[in-house]
Amino acid sequence: MRPILDLEIEASSGSSSSQVASNLSPVGEDYKPISLNLSLSFNNNNNNNLDLESSSLTLPLSSTSESSNPEQQQQQQPSVSKRVFSCNYCQRKFYSSQALGGHQNAHKRERTLAKRAMRMGLAGVFPGRGSSSNYAAAATAAALSCLPLHGSGNGNMTSFRTLGIRAHSSAHDVSMTRQTPETLIRNIARFNQGYFGNCIPFYVEDDEAEMLWPGSFRQATNAVAVEAGNDNLGERKMDFLDVKQAMDMESSLPDLTLKL
């Protein structure tokens, strides 16, 4: 005989077992590995339980995703501000103290060179205190105009401009060719406690000027025309009288010829 199977009882027992298995959901705070229920059920109430299980599965996944990205957490933290060092001369900013120290040492070297050139320039401008050469003063002034003085502004150059030194024109200084009256007097020959001509040095050559020697048979008009460049009238008369005196002396000599 065949056994009689009651399908209604088996279906009801299967549904009850599925309900019991589906109701087993984690409630505690500590999440443990969850086993998924793959059994099929025909009750509509089981949909809510599946939603709870899916939500419980998503929570640990989100926590692991946050812990697996430490770079994002570092980006969210506030960035530390870098220290900035500023120069005392030109207010330039540096990010390291070593770079600032080298920059300020360059400023100090420029300042020492400027002071040295200033002393040399003052010694050339005031001859009593140092070198009396005007060329040295012009050279030092030209060197001063080329110095790059960072952070000092135009203070140093204005102090030199008050002394009469101008940039880009000291090389063509006219004062080198000028001479004081004292130096001109020293270079002039003295005759009879006076000076020759209108302060003209004796070494100046004049092509038109000719010497009038005594005993020459030149006419007086030519003698005056030769010395027309001279402004001193007394000297012209003196030369003319000297010629006449020389001619009279020759005529006043005694005649020593023998006459028979």
UniProtKB/Swiss-Prot annotation:
Domain of life, source organism: Eukaryota
ZnF (C2H2-type) ranges: 85-107
Main location: nucleus
Keyword Nucleus assigned: yes
UniProt GO MF annotations: DNA-binding transcription factor activity; transcription cis-regulatory region binding; zinc ion binding
Keywords assigned: Abscisic acid signaling pathway, Metal-binding, Nucleus, Zinc, Zinc-finger
Cellular location(s): Nucleus
PROSITE patterns tied to this protein: ZINC_FINGER_C2H2_1 (PS00028), ZINC_FINGER_C2H2_2 (PS50157)
InterPro entries: ZFP3-like, Znf_C2H2_sf, Znf_C2H2_type
UniProt name for this protein: Zinc finger protein 4
Native organism: Arabidopsis thaliana (Mouse-ear cress)
